[in-house]
Design a protein with these regions (language model features):
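A basic, Ser/Thr-enriched alpha-helical scaffold prevalent
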Residues: 1-695
Length: 695
């Protein structure tokens, strides 16, 4: 008993000495020394107890060594974890690791799990760091359940970078969280722009891993194949954060790994094609979408909105009008079984035998979807179970027809919409258009539409005639007003009235009508806005970009380059999309040297202030220069991204480097370089290795 009391006194002295030390480094050293002393003293006590036990116990083989500090510290960790005391558990773990290394796998798993349940970013980061440390120093495979819980907790706490680190660790071992859990992880990651960058890159890595496993006929391939929900979450985020080029790359992965695009996918793909100006790609979906049944019409409002927007961007009023008429038709009320089966839509040229074809199922919606697609409502709205034109879309149509002098075609369109919407008698659309033209003093245009409606057997009401007559009178256009007055008398609108009485009535009607619409945001306001706004990108640019895209998809890069060279000759400024198409085309053929030439053009355009390169294009350039071994260009792009505060996914760049150039110049010293070119390249390679944290 005295011996045990002395041990306790000695232990208290050592701990008190540790607590009284003010220097942190000294405290650590003292604590480590104290723990070793405890181990020695406790072992001596245990030995004495054993000797006594041997003399008094007939079964000495049952001797227990629970008195060691190993067990004491393990017990402290266990107790602290049960009591959810993370500070104490972490301190005890560090003490244990300094003396004995890592604790047992089960205890280590409990610690990681308890840290994962914390909502404090501090402890979540500790958990992530611990996992990486274990993988680096301990030859043990951490159970995927621990990593799954941790990745979800990190994502929920808006820590996408460490969350992706854990996911990538799992992917390296060809293991991923269950798909429904991965949905949630990605859902939380893509709430932020940086999270979307990382999630999209991680999806690319999953697809690469899946393709590699499939080639090797690996059974794990089925477990890591991403589904349409993962694609939808990432693509929707690309739309929200305007990552159009990245979105295009993700879309092309779907047919490569055999993922079917559902109704949500199609809607999101439509928005990405709109952002990229790829009208021809979107038109390929139209025949399939036109055949969907009435219950799905609301869902595809965004599809028609995007396609109509592209028609306007291409200044194709005839196609816009045709699309509008298609929208106003009667939709089939019954679901069609054939639209619930996969259908193939080609990507790029239809004539390419080796071209990609994406599978779509227009009437497939996942019941347990966690995605809520919120498209914009700019041109097409949904009212009373039907798709209808917004005032903005109508203003664009009026502007387009007026610019090309085809008012009669506008009148025909308005009349057709009336007939197709089954509201011929009560529709106010033509009169709204005429009123808007009158407010903008486009009196000739208003009169032309009025005449067209009259000739088609659908004359306007007296109020519309009176408004136009009053406008003529105010503008002192007496010849036109007299002609209109004859029309009014012929139509029986002003019988047995003198001209003076007609003028008085018309002016009075016009005043009353203006007062009624004074506070109403109407078509005229949208027309004024449309006329004052110039197209951000001239229609001809979209035409050129479409041609370049077509040639690149057909692997006709020489024709694509010729088309690109014609742009400055015609004084047309290339856009980011122009360079995206070119770089993507050259990359598909692994023509990395040609990409360096395009990069030179891009730099000249940036220096002149005519171009701002997007983050997704910058990253794509960086990866291609890395694959081609152009490290000077790699560091240039990195410098550009730093200068513009763009997030850089170092994990991905590091992985790409190690895959392609792991031993490049690893042992070569600058003094041993044979040429100046090799010396400079060595310098850039070392700079890159240092930047991504290799060596």
């Amino acid at each position: 008993m005295n011996f045990r009391r002395e041990i306790g006194v000695e232990e208290n002295k050592l701990w008190s000495g540790l607590e009284e030390s003010e220097d942190e480094e000294e405290r650590r050293e003292m604590k480590g020394f104290e723990l070793k002393m405890i181990d020695i003293v406790v072992s001596m006590a245990a030995l004495a107890a054993v000797l006594l036990f041997v003399h008094t116990n007939p079964h000495p083989e049952r001797i227990c060594w629970e008195g060691s500090s190993n067990a004491v510290l393990s017990g402290k960790i266990e107790t602290a974890l049960k009591d959810h005391q993370l500070d104490e558990a972490w301190d005890s773990f560090n003490d244990f690791k300094r003396l004995y290394g890592f604790p047992k796998d089960t205890l280590l798993g409990k610690l990681i799990t308890e840290l994962s349940y914390s909502s404090d970013p501090h402890w979540l980061q500790k958990a992530c760091d611990l996992v990486l440390l274990v993988l680096k120093e301990k030859s043990v495979v951490l159970h995927s359940d621990f990593l799954t819980k941790l990745s979800l907790s990190l994502a929920r706490s808006q820590m996408p970078i460490p969350a992706s680190t854990i996911l990538r660790v799992m992917l390296e071992k060809e293991s991923l969280p269950p798909m429904n859990v991965l949905w949630l992880v990605v859902l939380h990651m893509v709430k932020t722009e940086i999270g979307t960058y990382i999630a999209s890159n991680f999806l690319v890595q999953i697809c690469d891993c899946f393709q590699h496993s499939s080639v090797n006929q690996n059974e794990q391939a089925k477990l890591i194949k991403p589904d349409s929900m993962i694609f939808n979450l990432v693509l929707d985020a690309c739309v929200r954060f305007k990552l159009s080029f990245k979105g295009h790359q993700i879309i092309e992965l779907m047919p490569r790994i055999g993922v079917v695009a559902d109704a949500h996918s199609i809607t999101i793909i439509a928005q990405i094609h709109e952002m990229n100006g790829q009208r021809d790609e979107l038109k390929k979906f139209k025949d399939h979408i036109d055949r969907v049944s009435a219950p799905f019409v609301f869902h595809y409002r965004q599809f028609y909105d995007s396609l109509l927007s592209l028609h306007f961007k291409f200044n194709d009023i005839d196609s816009a009008a045709s699309l509008v008429l298609d929208m106003y038709r009667d939709w089939e009320s019954n679901l069609r079984k054939e639209l619930q089966k996969p259908r193939l839509v080609p990507m790029g040229s239809d004539n390419l035998k080796s071209g990609l074809k994406i599978q779509i199922v227009p009437e497939m919606l996942q019941k347990d979807s966690i995605l809520k697609v919120e498209g914009k409502q700019e041109l097409i709205t949904f009212r009373n179970g039907k798709l209808t034109l917004s005032n903005k879309a109508l203003a664009k149509l009026i502007k387009g027809y007026k610019r090309i002098g085809k008012i009669s075609d506008l009148s025909k369109l308005l009349l057709s919409i009336q007939k197709k919407s089954h509201t011929l008698g009560g529709s106010s659309l033509p009169s709204d258009v005429i009123d808007a033209c009158i407010k903008l003093r486009w009196l000739e245009t208003a009169h032309d539409i009025l005449d067209d409606m009259e000739a088609a057997g659908a004359p306007m009401g007296s109020t519309t005639y009176f408004s136009l007559f009053a406008a003529y009178y105010k503008e002192k256009m007496f010849r036109e007003s007299k002609a209109l007055l004859k029309q009014m008398k012929k139509a029986g609108l002003v019988l047995n009235l003198s001209d003076e009485m007609v003028v008085s009535i018309c002016l009075s009607e016009a005043v009353d009508k203006n007062a009624m619409h004074a506070k109403k945001s109407d078509l005229a306001e949208f027309l004024v806005r449309e006329m004052s706004e110039e197209n951000a990108v001239p229609p001809m640019v979209y035409e050129f970009n479409s041609s370049i895209y077509f040639f690149c998809k057909a692997k006709m890069v020489e024709d694509a380059l010729k088309t690109y060279r014609r742009m400055p000759e015609m004084k047309i400024q290339p856009t980011v999309q122009t360079f995206c198409n070119l770089v993507y085309g050259y990359s598909s053929l692994e023509m990395y040297r040609d990409i360096t030439i395009i990069w030179g053009d891009m730099k000249r355009n940036m220096e002149s202030g005519n171009l701002v390169v997007s983050r997704d294009l910058s990253e794509f350039l960086l990866l291609n220069f890395l694959r081609g071994g152009y490290f000077e260009r790699v560091m240039e792009v990195i410098g550009y991204m730093k200068e513009h505060s763009m997030y850089t996914d170092k994990w991905m760049y590091k992985s790409e480097f190690l895959k392609l150039h792991k031993n490049l110049y690893r042992t070569l010293k600058a003094s041993k370089a044979k040429t100046d070119a090799q010396s400079k390249r060595l310098e850039y390679v070392k700079a890159f290795r240092k930047w991504v944290g290799i060596d």
